[in-house]
């Protein structure tokens, strides 16, 4: 950045800003051998394709369970907008998967609305093992579609309230193979419509080496909470009527100048006729910045 011209009559200056792109094409080679089995993967990844900001990944991998390749393309801001997209395709010896996402997030605290569309189709073989030996093999197929629109409700001081309205198509079924020995798991369809409330207490800091190396990150030290309540719907394909609950709470604490504690708790529940399933998970991540280029991280799940 340098001053290129000074205008004395109005006491202003013209500033020339020069930017350049770093070479971001990274090759990937991974090789290992254990117990007479050789695993390897090769590929390339570029986080700034031709200076466009788009990301591409090409991988080919082989291990003792499968062989396959992966192609992924992501655009974090399509044509300079606040929309972002991800397209990914994987073809493996035991199945294949497609994934597409189109999102306009709440890209700033004052954003009035958001939108998301997420589609996934996946087919894979599942193996059951006993004492290290494969004893059963069957196929699982997943069809997933989720979309929602979100609205900002209110902003009081540094507290932002939001409401998301959406639906999820979630259909999983199982198929026999020539090596299926045991009974298949039951097919399930948990398609639902839902409402989600979000609370964000804004206390953002620009930090370094927290979740990513050599990048400045906007980390929120305020509380973040969300509560989603869904109702399973037969007209969407659900097997049964029932309710879904998904609640999450997150917070980051700065213990001292170089030490941070990131906490996340989540509760999930599914209520069907005669069925009650609940899951609680918790994660703590302790980050201590050693230097400007390195951090020590400890994670407890």
Model-derived regions, located:
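Transmembrane beta-strand segments of outer-membrane beta-barrel domains in Gram-negative
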Residues: 90-285
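Periplasmic polypeptide-binding modules associated with outer-membrane biogenesis and secretion
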Residues: 1-33, 37, 43-46, 59-61, ...
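A generic structural micro-environment signature
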Residues: 9, 25, 37, 55, ...
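Short secondary-structure junctions
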Residues: 1, 80-81
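Active-site gating/interface segments in enzymes
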Residues: 281-285, 295-301
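Transmembrane beta-strand segments that form the barrel wall of outer-membrane beta-barrel proteins
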Residues: 24-33, 40-42, 46-48, 52-63, ...
